[in-house]
Amino acid sequence: MEPLHADAVLAFRARHTATGLFEATLIPGIEAVLDGLAADGVTVGLATAKPTEQARTTLDHFGLADRFAVVAGGVADGLPRSKAMIVGDALAQLAEVGLRDPSRMAMVGDRRHDVEGGRAHGVTTVAVGWGYAQPDEWADIEPHHQATDPVELLALLRSLP
């Protein structure tokens, strides 16, 4: 990573940790998705490009930490990691709690990297219609499924094997 780029990443992370995560808002309907999955006995994990501790702090801030069995972050030893590596870490953590079959899992995300990361491990991919993706981001990658809102996402996840 170029020194100037590395400095910018460090500055962004510092601001995000200090104030940015507290300025964020939850996508309306996401808590209902998590409640529905919990009621169905589904184990939920998080695979994020954010550093693991930032992700945990964000989950704590929103009162969601207890809904995620595993959290895999994007920084290990200070080096950037691909989404495939992060998903691999999440899968390894899930295996530690007895969940070992990627074909019975789904990677839900708003960016093409989420789809690529899930596909790299044989995980069903679901692209969501909110978040940071550009309108044409899915054009050439073809996730297995797409959901336009949290209600559709929950119904879709419930329909998977």
Predicted regions: what they are:
Residues 1-2, 29, 149-152:
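Acidic/polar helix N-cap motif
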Residues 4-13:
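Acidic catalytic patch
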Residues 6, 35-38, 52, 56-161:
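Asp-based, Mg2+/Mn2+-dependent phosphohydrolase catalytic module
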Residues 15-18, 72:
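Short amphipathic alpha-helical segments at helix-loop
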Residues 18-46, 52-56:
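Short, acidic loop-to-helix structural element flanking the phosphoryl-transfer center
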